[in-house]
Each structure stands twice: as structure tokens, then as C-alpha cells.
Swiss-Prot record:
General function of this protein: Catalyzes the NAD(P)(+)-dependent oxidation of D-glucose to D-gluconate via gluconolactone. Can utilize both NAD(+) and NADP(+) as electron acceptor. Is involved in the degradation of glucose through a non-phosphorylative variant of the Entner-Doudoroff pathway.
UniProt binding sites for substrate: 37, 83, 108, 144, 148, 294
Annotated binding of Zn(2+) 1, by residue: 35, 60-61, 144
Source superkingdom: Archaea
InterPro entries tied to this protein: ADH-like_N, Glc_1-DH_arc, Glu_dehyd_C, GroES-like_sf, NAD(P)-bd_dom_sf, Zn_alcohol_dh
Residues annotated as binding NADP(+): 182-185, 204-206, 264-266, 292-294, 341
Signal peptide: none
Family membership noted in the UniProt record: Belongs to the zinc-containing alcohol dehydrogenase family. Glucose 1-dehydrogenase subfamily.
The protein's name: Glucose 1-dehydrogenase 1
Single annotated GO MF: zinc ion binding
Reactions performed catalytically: D-glucose + NAD(+) = D-glucono-1,5-lactone + NADH + H(+); D-glucose + NADP(+) = D-glucono-1,5-lactone + NADPH + H(+)
Annotated Zn(2+) 2 binding sites: 87, 90, 93, 101
Keyword line: Carbohydrate metabolism, Metal-binding, NAD, NADP, Nucleotide-binding, Oxidoreductase, Zinc
Length: 352
């Protein structure tokens, strides 16, 4: 079958015929999503990526159609595979939560230990499949990254139970959250935080482009240019830009006492200057800093439900989510979009 192949730790990408055997029901892949992790692997920038027998099938975002009945699913169902699998040894993995793997030996589809989903067919166990409602067929590919954010917000709220965090009226309306980064992840974080009732701010080191302005207007989120001085403080900050450690150094002091700082993704450049004064500020203000990564099956189901809700609540934004569709037969364009993000991009899909 045809597949998109990489050879980590080296750079480069190609479309090749491969023979990969698998267990479980067959799934015909209809489309894949492209994210920053895929591009880091293609460009040889992700040290965690590993080859299997000399190559690796790329991709951890996929939508497919089930080709046979299972215990709980039926032939013809739209399904999405979970991208992280357990090590099989630690307690969390054995209890279905490999997002908290204790050995660090979890498998990541299209990244390490497991071939990815950018291929014509896969076979997979039913327990790793999530049924996709037909009503969100056009934007369902967003559920995989959104699942990671569902888990992230769940984690933030759980951690902040260390104090009384809800407002006097029982909502989160009085809690201000700043998101750094206006890409796919930043926008999805903004939508999710608005759904939870937070007062949401989103930021970048520039002014918003036209598409971003339309989205932020519909979401009723406020915009901050990080190149300018920011005189406000926030109850939580989510770093979703992955641009450099200077963003963390710039925004961490903006947290209020008892604040939460979540880091999603990987900073590409820089060194964080942890002076004694910097660390004292974290201690005296009782700041919590948490790395945010990977949602599991319950979070993907939550993501599906939120996408259904948002098609009604935020119709303009959801209609702009898919920036481009690229056919697997257009190899030249495929290599371009797998290597570099285009300006104004939210999500690009590969169509099989």
C-alpha cells in the first residue's frame, strides 16, 4: 500500500509502497491532518522520532472508515484511531492512561515505536478507535489535537482545586486566561476555554491577520500584542506558540498569585534564565508550572461533542478551520505542506 515515509533522525519525506501487517479490523484511511510535530520530523528537528526497521510511516491524525463489524462498531462507521499506546508495564498504561506513562516507553503513532497513520490502510484494535459522528465529518480531523487540549484544561482545573478557583457565582467568568500563540492549538484552546466560561485573551508578537481577527471577534476573545507592554495580570497562562523560551520569560511574571502556567508543545529556541529572583517569584506567588501533552479516548470523545456544539455556536470559525486539502497524488504540494507552515494556516488535510 501507499504510505508517507520518513527516516528519522534524518530530514526528508517520500511517498512509497510498503507492506505492514497489523492486528484488528481493517480501516481505510480517508484523510490525515498535518501538525507541527509532523513537520519537525520531516525537517529532522524532533529528537524523539525513531525509525522502525529503517523507516517510519508518518502521521498521528487520521480519519477512516471501518471495513468490518466489531463488538461495538459497525462496518461503514467513521472512526479515528488514538495515537498514543501504553508501555504495557506501568500502572497508568495498564489502566488505559498512557498519557501518564511512568516508564517513558509509550508508543506514539508516527513518532516513536509505532508506524503512523499516513497510509492507505491500517488495522487496529477496537479499544483504540473512536466513532466519529457524521455531522462533523468535515472538521472531525480537529478532534485529535482538541483531545489533547481537553485533557489539558481538565488538568488545569484539577490542579487549581488546590484553592477555591471558581468565582463567587460558581462560574469561571472572573478568571482571566492568556493564550500565547494564534495557530491551530491557540485557537482551539480559546474555543475550549470560552466554552468553560473563562475570560479569554490570546496573543502573538504581531497584530492579528484578517482570518484571526474574524475568529477572535466571533469567539469574543481579546487580543494582546506581546511586542507591546502588557499591564494586565492573569489567573492562568497557556503557552501554545512553541516559538522560543523568551515567550515564557516574558509572560510568566504576568501571573497573579496562585496562578497556573501550562506549557503545550516544545520551545524551538532559547535558554530560560532561571535566576534566584525568578525562582523566588514562583515560590512566593505559589505558581504552578505544568507540561501539557496527549489526551486519551475519553478526551477524544469530549472533543467530538465540542465540535458538534461549535458548528452551531461558532459557525464562522468552524468553517475556516480547514485551510487546504491536498491530494495524496499531488506529491510536489504534499512535500511543501509537510515541510513548512503557510501564513494563515489553521489545518491542512491530506486526502486519500
Amino acid at each position: 500500500m501507499k504510505a508517507i515515509i520518513v527516516h528519522p533522525p534524518g530530514a526528508g519525506v517520500s511517498i512509497e509502497d510498503v507492506n505492514i501487517n497489523g492486528n484488528g479490523p481493517g480501516i481505510k484511511i480517508l484523510e490525515n491532518g498535518i501538525c507541527g510535530t509532523d513537520r519537525e520530523i520531516v525537517n529532522g528537528e524532533l529528537s524523539a522520532a525513531t525509525s522502525l526497521n529503517g523507516f517510519l510511516v508518518l502521521g498521528h491524525e487520521a480519519l477512516g472508515i471501518l471495513e468490518e463489524d466489531t463488538k461495538n462498531l459497525r462496518k461503514g462507521d467513521l472512526v479515528m484511531p488514538i495515537n498514543r499506546r501504553g508501555c504495557g508495564r506501568c500502572l497508568n498504561c495498564m489502566l488505559g492512561r498512557p498519557d501518564f506513562c511512568e516508564t517513558g516507553e509509550q508508543l506514539e503513532a508516527g513518532i516513536s515505536g509505532m508506524h503512523g497513520f499516513m497510509r492507505e490502510y491500517i488495522n487496529d484494535d477496537e479499544r483504540y478507535l473512536v466513532k466519529v459522528p457524521d455531522v462533523i465529518r468535515d472538521i472531525a480531523i480537529m478532534a485529535q489535537p482538541l483531545a489533547d487540549l481537553e485533557k489539558s484544561i481538565e488538568e488545569m482545573i484539577s490542579i487549581q482545586k488546590r484553592l477555591h478557583w471558581p468565582c463567587i457565582d460558581g462560574t469561571y467568568n472572573c478568571r482571566k486566561v492568556l493564550i500565547t500563540g494564534t495557530g491551530t492549538i491557540g485557537i482551539l484552546f480559546a474555543m475550549l476555554l470560552k466554552t468553560y466560561g473563562f475570560s479569554v485573551y490570546i496573543s502573538n508578537k504581531r497584530e492579528p491577520n484578517d482570518i484571526e481577527s474574524k475568529i477572535f471577534d466571533e469567539l469574543s476573545v481579546k487580543y494582546k500584542n506581546l511586542s507591546n507592554k502588557i499591564d494586565e495580570s492573569f489567573d492562568a497562562i497557556i503557552e501554545a506558540s512553541g516559538s522560543g523560551t523568551d515567550v515564557i520569560e516574558r509572560t510568566l511574571p504576568l501571573l497573579k498569585n496562585n496562578g497556573f502556567y501550562g506549557i503545550f508543545g516544545f520551545e524551538k529556541t532559547g535558554t530560560l534564565n532561571l535566576t534566584s529572583e525568578f525562582l523566588q517569584g514562583i515560590v512566593y506567588k505559589s505558581i504552578n508550572i505544568t507540561g501539557l501533552i496527549n489526551g486519551q479516548k475519553p478526551h477524544m470523545e469530549m472533543a467530538m461533542n465540542h465540535l458538534i456544539q461549535w458548528k452551531k455556536q461558532f459557525p464562522k470559525t468552524t468553517s475556516m478551520m480547514i485551510t487546504e486539502k491536498v491530494s495524496i497524488n499531488n506529491e510536489r504540494r504534499l512535500k511543501e505542506v509537510l515541510s513548512k507552515k503557510r501564513p494563515g494556516e489553521i489545518k491542512i488535510k491530506i486526502i486519500w
